[in-house]
From Swiss-Prot:
One of its GO terms (biological process) is phosphorelay signal transduction system. Required for the inhibition of NifA activity in response to oxygen and low level of fixed nitrogen. Changing M250V: In strain: NG13. It comes from Klebsiella oxytoca. Changing L425F: In strain: NG13. Residues 94-148 form the PAC domain. This is Nitrogen fixation regulatory protein. InterPro entries: DGC-Regulatory_Protein, HATPase_C_sf, N_fixation_neg-reg_NifL, PAC, PAS, PAS-assoc_C, PAS-like_dom_sf, PAS_fold. Keywords: Nitrogen fixation, Repeat, Transcription, Transcription regulation, Two-component regulatory system. PROSITE patterns: PAC, PAS. Residues 23-93, 151-174 form the PAS domain.
């Protein structure tokens, strides 16, 4: 019989019979050389055959196995319920598959994945049990080791205070930890990476960004760091190609407290710089006032010398005049410079943000500060800290005067616009102008600039070649306008 005839009569029994006729020992040879452990028992479950793979697996020779019950291999590690389920299935003449912990001849235990099939004769009577089993101890050990590693890794990741997330090449989340899930829940169930508007593809390996995000109505600052992870394909079609698009590990840490501490430190340093600027301006203003007061008698002495003649020999008059001139020169040398920093161009929005941060705690339900700009792209020019000190002096003055009018809630409006090369700052409030001009502060001698805010503002504005205008508002209150030249105005358009 040819193979074509066998295929034409595609019946398993016919094919098996034909192969047996052509190759009488084929099936026996196949079973003998099979790498799978195969055993055959009679209907009473006594072993009547075992192939070499079975003997190698169990440690018993074929002679030792013949006429023995397979319970010879059983161990107490397999639960009794497993055997009961197995025999219940086999007695119903159904095949059974499961896992058993068997014992070798040397006492060693091993785990097998076993298939037992009842073999029936043509009359449907049970004649044999065919068992094929594979030792899966090594694969099970590796599987459990991997599971333990995954459990350990998940436990470690979930106990890390930072959020950890792995994304694929399309920025889809592949794995995340409990902290990341908590962040997403706090964001109203939205994906945290989407809220941060961050893409690892746009960040280089090891790159770090500090980004703000609104969590439960409050702004929090998160540090985002990325690392590339080598990928291994999970698709069966890429079994022989051990490569896959790289994934990205992202660690997201809450640095809000550190950010707040840094910001508070920066504001404290800014306060110190502003206080130093106010103090220098107060000293300069006081010395200028002293120079003006001293200049009058010195001019009178100079006039007297001219009337008497410079060579008249009036020693006392000449000595008084020289002492006065030297005193004037000493005072001039003592006048501090107001140049605490170099002139520069800076954006106005962060400037106003700093002003609001400095005075946020001083405004409550009875005091309101509103800041507006004609354009979000406005810039200022000059010494940023000194111009900030100008606004600070005015706010200090206004808040102090408003405290004397407890029945009137304070409202301050700050508006900025650019007007033909000048930056104009409009400060409007509801404090009467007369009180602003003539109010006296009892703390003028105890605090730098206290009680002389308007004069100090004039000094700082004049130093920046600016202009100041103080007027009463038609609807009541005071309007202070500060005008500062922009860079183009001072340089004739050259930058």
């Amino acid at each position: 019989m040819t193979l074509n005839m066998m295929l034409d009569n595609a019946v398993p029994e016919a094919i098996a019979g034909a192969l047996t006729q052509q190759h009488p020992g084929l099936f026996f040879t196949m079973v003998e050389q099979a790498s799978v452990a195969i055993s055959l028992t009679d209907a009473r479950a006594n072993i009547i055959y075992a192939n070499p793979a079975f003997c190698r697996q169990t440690g018993y020779s074929l002679a030792q196995l013949l006429n023995q019950n397979p319970r010879l291999l059983a161990s107490s590690q397999t639960p009794r319920e497993i055997y009961q389920e197995m025999w219940q299935t086999l007695l119903q003449r159904q095949p059974w598959r499961g896992q058993l912990i068997n014992q070798r001849r040397d006492g060693g235990l091993y785990l097998v994945d076993i298939d037992i099939t009842p073999v029936l004769n043509p009359q449907g009577e049970l004649e044999h049990y065919l068992a094929m089993q594979r030792d899966i101890s090594v694969s099970y050990t590796l599987e459990q080791r991997l599971r333990n590693h995954m459990t350990l890794m998940e436990a470690v990741l979930n106990n890390i205070p930072a959020a950890v997330v792995v994304v694929d090449e399309q920025d889809r989340v592949v794995m995340d930890n409990l902290a990341y899930k908590t962040f997403c829940a706090d964001c109203g169930g939205k994906e945290l990476l989407v809220e941060l508007q961050v893409s690892p593809r746009k960040m280089g390996p090891g790159a770090e960004q500090i980004l703000p995000v609104v969590v439960r109505g409050a702004v929090r600052w998160l540090s985002v760091t990325c690392w590339a992870l080598p990928g291994v394909s999970e698709e069966a079609s890429r079994y022989f190609v051990d490569s896959a698009p790289a994934r990205t590990l992202m660690v997201i840490a809450d640095c809000t407290q550190q950010r707040q501490q840094q910001e508070q430190g920066r504001l404290d340093r800014l306060k110190q710089q502003m206080t130093a600027g106010k103090l220098l301006a107060a000293i300069r203003e006081s010395l200028d006032a002293a120079l003006i007061q001293l200049n009058c008698p010195i001019n009178m002495l100079a006039a007297a010398r001219r009337l008497n003649g410079e060579g008249s020999g009036n020693v006392a008059l000449d000595a008084a005049w020289r002492e006065g001139e030297e005193a004037m020169a000493r005072l001039q040398r003592c006048r501090p410079s107001l140049e605490l920093e170099s002139n520069a161009v800076w954006p106005l929005q962060p400037f106003f943000d700093d002003l609001y941060a400095l005075y946020r705690t001083r405004f409550d339900d009875r005091a309101r500060l509103q800041v507006d700009m004609a354009s979000p792209h406005l810039v200022g020019f000059g010494q940023r800290t000194q111009l900030l000190a100008c606004l600070s002096l005015w706010l200090d003055r206004t808040l102090a005067l408003a405290a004397e009018l407890p029945s009137v809630p304070l409202e301050i409006e700050l508006y900025a616009e650019e007007d033909e090369g000048w930056l104009s700052l409009y400060l409007n409030d509801n404090v009467p102008l007369l009180q602003v001009r003539y109010a006296h502060s009892p703390d003028a001698l105890n605090s730098p600039g206290k009680g002389m805010e308007l004069r100090l503002i004039q000094t700082l504005v004049a130093y920046h070649r600016g202009a100041i205008e103080l007027a009463s508002r038609p609807q009541g209150g005071t309007s202070l306008v500060l005008r500062f030249p922009l860079f183009n105005t001072l340089t004739g358009g050259e930058q």
